[in-house]
Amino acid sequence: MTSADLAGRVLAGEPRAIARAISLVEDDEVAGANLIRAIFSRTGRAYLIGVTGPPGAGKSTLVDRLVAEFRRQRATVGVIAVDPTSPFTGGAVLGDRLRMQSHSGDEDVFIRSMATRGHLGGLSRATGDAALVLDAAGKDVVIIETVGVGQDEVEIVRTADVSVVTLVPGAGDEVQALKAGIMEIADVFVVNKGDREGADRLVTAVEGTLALHSYGTGDWRPPIVKTVATSGSGVPELVRAIEQFRAHAGAQAPARAEARRRVRAEHRLRELVTQGFLDRLERSVLAPGELSDVAARIAAREIDPYSAAASLIARGRA
């Protein structure tokens, strides 16, 4: 099947074509790039929701409830669950999230797990492209759930239109909430497992941290929504908070929303240019295994990483 054929089937919303397309952008760099070229002009309509937070915060259950709520509103939904990579298979450890199987018979919901493949920011290299596939396939909402790796989750801002930071009482989140990186990426805070002891203290801690920030007229102040994802309590309120942020971004701060899209595009462009340069360097300039040899020299403290990088860049320019 050609990229054009597959693109046509993705645009028609065929589930098998969507699955094949996401596999392509994960595993076949050239074919994946050709596919994105074919569908890119038909993207930009879906609303991307990033859900992040520490391990054990109940993010998967929360996403499952979010899907149900959006479907109740008749929105079509795509989910990308970014999982840790298995060191043995290279695949996503948790697979296609058994906790979301209640939606498996719904053709208007597409759920896919993707492996981080060692990417420290928590997002798979191909997550952005997978979101484009779901966007092109006509999904109204695309939810990206990330692995919980703390402040490295700032990367989610570059992919999502709204970032939902999920916290849970009793996991040290009173301290975590004070960390600047988490504060900077949150558009909406969720205190999940809100029926647990300490939930109200956590809400107070987050409110106290928000109070330290100065918000100008028209600025968005992240709301704090308390949920119990296992029962669905608070999930409609969370969806309303997300929709309020979307309306605010569109009406009150369109320039800021556009700037966020530009930052996202620039990040992806830099990522592709950097990867392309490195691929060219390895293919055309370096001897087989030379990059690994240089890395070994850095690890052995025989050369510093800046000098090594400068030397390789100079050779690439020659």
Name each model-derived stretch:
Residues 2-15, 51-55, 60, 214, ...:
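Expand to "…catalyze enediolate/carbanion chemistry for C-C bond making/breaking, isomerization
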Residues 2-49, 54-57, 62-152, 159-169, ...:
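Nucleotide-state-sensitive switch-loop elements of NTP-binding domains
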Residues 80, 166, 191-192, 227:
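Generic beta-sheet signal
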Residues 156, 169-197:
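Flexible active-site lid/hinge loop adjacent to a nucleotide/diphosphate
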Residues 188, 194-248:
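Canonical P-loop GTPase G-domain recognition
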Residues 93, 130, 155, 159, ...:
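Alpha-helical scaffold elements adjacent to nucleotide-binding pockets in ATP/GTP-utilizing enzyme cores
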Residues 226, 237-317:
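Long, well-ordered amphipathic alpha-helical subdomains in the mid-to-C-terminal portions
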Residues 14, 83, 145, 192, ...:
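Residue-level signal for inorganic ion chemistry
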